[in-house]
Amino acid sequence: MSKRTFQPNNRKRAKTHGFRLRMRTRAGRAILSARRAKGRQKLSA
């Protein structure tokens, strides 16, 4: 049997998809502004 692919880990999640990471690059900031424009409750993980 192969293991499940999703092994939840909050620290890994934040480091890969977190707000600080999004703010780091221009593209990431574009993602955040798009999500703000759409009216998302959560901007990032």
UniProtKB/Swiss-Prot annotation:
The keyword Iron-sulfur does not apply. It holds the Pfam family Ribosomal_L34. GO terms for molecular function: structural constituent of ribosome. InterPro entries: Ribosomal_bL34, Ribosomal_bL34_CS. Keywords: Ribonucleoprotein, Ribosomal protein. GO terms for cellular component: ribonucleoprotein complex; ribosome. The keyword Ribonucleoprotein applies. It comes from the Bacteria. GO terms for biological process: translation. PROSITE patterns: RIBOSOMAL_L34. Belongs to the bacterial ribosomal protein bL34 family. This is Large ribosomal subunit protein bL34.
